[in-house]
Amino acid sequence: SEGGIAGVGVAEWVSGATETVSEETVSTLVGGEDPSQRERMGDMMYRATSPFGRKGAAVEAISAVDVAFWDIAGKEADKRVYELLGGPVTDEIPCYASNLHPVDHEKLEREALEYVEAGFDTMKMRFLHGPEAGRKGMRENEALVETVRDAVGDDIAIAADAYMGWSVRYAKKMLDRLERYDLAWVEEPVIPDDIDGYADI
């Protein structure tokens, strides 16, 4: 900012592409501009990066700059950013353990129990298999969920992430098999663009 305040913004999943978009496109747009003009700058960045697509590196770069603008605003006002956004709306923010990556059933069970001991009442695991693994993969996915459910009991919420690896047909079959385990949610069974697929599921 003109007052010498630096804002910090972070892009997750940083890749060479994100760095390139940040340095060669986004930074050239916002350099010397008024960081309090967040909406105008956001619109400018969004338009300038449209040839790069509306997902991935371009949006990550824009997001990092937007966060930095908010960081500057908070520092200038001597307030936390959440106060600038209207203040707290709750006394607590729910969180969950999100690192249950199946390697084998014993390790998965041990990790799940460690999360319970650490005080988590919700945890998310990953599936190992998609349609290419056929019925055997379905059985193994179910067995992994069963391992976690048996380990933590019914009072702990379990979610699971397919990371866009399923087809609609496979997802519907898999979700039918998993219904008895009372999962809190199944994340990204198909790609985000498949709106009709999500409606079908």
Residue ranges and their predicted role:
Residues 39-42, 85, 109, 172:
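Generic structural signal for individual residues within well-ordered alpha-helical segments
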Residues 66-102:
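Glycine-rich, aromatic-flanked loop segments that form ligand/cofactor-binding clefts
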Residues 2-76:
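Metal- or metallocofactor-binding catalytic centers and their adjacent structured scaffolds
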Residues 32, 79, 87, 154-155, ...:
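Short, well-ordered coil loops that connect the C-terminus of an alpha-helix to the N-terminus
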Residues 35, 54, 82, 90, ...:
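Secondary-structure boundary/capping residues
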Residues 27, 42, 49, 62, ...:
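Generic secondary-structure boundary/loop-capping signal
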Residues 92-200:
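Metal-dependent enolase-superfamily TIM-barrel catalytic cores that perform enediolate-based chemistry
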